Amino acid sequence: QFDAAALKAATPLGKGLGASPGAACGKVVFTAEDAEEWNARGEKVVLVRLETSPEDITGMKASQGILTVRGGMTSHAAVVARGMGTCCVSGCGDIAMDEENKKFTLAGKEFHEGDYISIDGTTGNIYDGAIKTVDATIAGEFGRVMAWADKYRTLKVRTNADTPADAKKARELGAEGIGLCRTEHMFFEEDRIAAFREMICSDTVEEREAALEKILPYQQGDFEALYEALEGNPVTIRFLDPPLHEFVPTEEADIEKLANAQGKSVETIKNIIASLHEFNPMMGHRGCRLAVTYPEIAKMQTKAVIRAAINVQKKHADWTVKPEIMIPLVCEVKELKFVKKVVVETADAEIAAAGVNLEYEVGTMIEIPRAALTADEIATEADFFCFGTNDLTQMTFGFSRDDAGKFLNAYYDTKIFENDPFAKLDQNGVGKLMETAIKLGKPVNPKLHVGICGEHGGDPSSVEFCHKIGLDYVSCSPFRVPIARLAAAQAAISNK
């Protein structure tokens, strides 16, 4: 947090959305690579981007704070920053960005690479220069209040975590499992992105499988580390979700490197990259649609999940390691049936080959309205439902979470909306779809367990709604776990 006296003396230059709380001060950098490089030599940096994407992960980790021109409360930058406990201000549309020349203008002032800037992830305020920061503290009463909360709540609280470090932090803050592990973030590490790009640019199934075989040990290692961190608590692993264009290189040097590795011309690689372009990627070739087109991806991920679980279970006989495999973006039961068949055949073969007993579950995310409306059909094939309320909100409202920031302020000013539907669950519309899905799904499959893993899982009023409609758990960013625990207790008491 900022030093109170220093903050009082400062005047904000501009304002975005307070997307991830905290305070950050550092030198401006414009690329993830620069953030890593500067951080490695001991510089504190603030990463400034038009918007972030999964390939920026390593640079985001190296930054004190993140500032984006585009995006709302559930944009990539906001969600990832909250998960890492990194300060983030998103959607500051007043910034005029000049990425090519590594500079931007805000309130008439020009900022260049290396200039100091301070951002407040709670208020969304942006300041010129360096403001002194002090470490945030947790008072001794925290543990006592949390113990009271745990005594009364009936909702379980899990976390959204992709790394053992995030999982460990969430466990310290009281999380009872992982409700969402986004496997795509694991592909961006330096040693595996090359193999994944090789897979994308392959011409045949055999070539794709050979590239995926290189990634398998890395992915398996990631899952083993997560299972170790969770000590037998549940881990829900979402299979590959983003469209493939997010993984391909954009820099000329990286394209040449990929062409050389593939033994293809730069022109051919550029054509492959161009072919991945989509007009609306959010509703394009992503989620389970990737697993239908390329079942070999789902096979590789299943092998990694199951092998990791078997290894960790063998090491810790007193733990119950029961993988939960989550298929994203399902809108039709036959889709789930198709992907589930691939998963089950692969998993059962792995378990048989190892000569062990291992239980696992296959469930789905409910993030498309049609999935909620046909939940009675989908429940016949799913062991669990998890509401991905970030996508369910944008699909229900029909506006993109990354573009909504441009007009939502006008909606608040004119009182069309009272709240940001991406931050506070829309109970009348999105909530009604959730209720419908539960009412349709549970009678068909009484063992169905249901959770939520959108950012709403850390919002108190949304948590109360989840309690009311009978969810089993909420899952949120690690640093929001205490809020969810408290909100779940308040919901239990007020709804007695």
Q: Predicted regions span which residues?
A:
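Acidic, glycine-rich flexible loop/linker segments
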Residues: Q1-A35, N39-K44, R49-E176, L180-C181, ...
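Conserved alpha/beta-domain cores
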Residues: I138, W148-K496
